A protein has these predicted regions:
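Flexible, low-hydrophobicity surface segments
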Residues: 1-164
């Protein structure tokens, strides 16, 4: 694309198919035997995981597995994911685990994953997984996070400051 195209109108070629219901999306592609995944995610900004009860989800027809951190093989279970782009300016390297083990540090952190025959079964089963949390103090503002005595975003770190 040359400079002459910046700011110029571009005719959209995909609209007729999409507007008439003839468009194809990745979700329209059906692969026989494919399984679907849905993550169980933390509703809390900071909490300790007390327990995960997947019994109800596992009894649902079409559910193949509910995987938690304790089900993962080593080293995925005990080691955090590697820092892909190490930066010497970081005071402490803090990468997350594939699935939360003992603590969740942000809303939406994956706690478990449900594997099922369809997306909808996986979503329903994920909703049936019962996670008990011990909610910890959290801080949601950068200015508050660096104040003396502020709750730490990650319990295993000594500060909320990643780099100076």
């Amino acid at each position: 694309m040359g400079v002459k195209h910046f700011g110029a109108r571009v005719k959209r070629l995909e609209d007729p198919a999409l507007l008439t219901g003839r468009g194809r999306f990745v979700d329209d592609v059906k692969v026989p035997g494919v399984l679907h995944a849905c993550f169980v995610r933390s509703p809390y900004a900071h909490a300790r995981l007390q327990s995960i009860d997947a019994k109800a989800a596992m009894t649902m027809p079409g559910v193949h597995a509910v995987i938690t951190a304790s089900d993962l093989p080593e080293p995925m279970r005990s080691q955090p994911m590697p820092m892909l782009l190490p930066n010497p300016a970081l005071a402490a390297v803090c990468t997350q685990h594939v699935l939360a083990r003992d603590e969740v540090c942000y809303v939406g952190q994956a706690v478990a994953v449900v594997v099922a025959d369809t997306r909808y079964i996986a979503e329903d089963a994920a909703a049936a997984v019962i996670v008990n949390y011990d909610v910890l103090d959290a801080v949601g503002d950068c200015r508050d996070a660096i104040k003396e005595g502020a709750p730490r975003a990650h319990s295993d770190l000594t500060t909320n400051v990643a780099s100076t």
